[in-house]
């Protein structure tokens, strides 16, 4: 399973989402539209994709 690492532009909070578990629209670049759980702003930066450790 893939994990996406997001960093919020507004409050610099970093969080993870599963690739199939993101909500919102998917853009042409396959970047998930997610909202920061800390400040609620839309966060679009995806730092990297990593494998989830099982």
From Swiss-Prot:
Belongs to the phi29likevirus gp16.6 family. It comes from Bacillus phage phi15. The gene is 16.6. This is Gene product 16.6. Keywords: Early protein.
């Amino acid at each position: 399973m893939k994990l996406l690492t997001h960093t919020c532009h507004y409050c610099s909070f970093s969080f993870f989402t599963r690739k199939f578990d993101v909500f919102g629209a998917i853009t042409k670049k396959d970047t998930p539209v997610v909202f920061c759980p800390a400040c609620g702003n839309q966060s679009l930066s995806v730092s990297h994709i990593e494998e989830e450790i099982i």
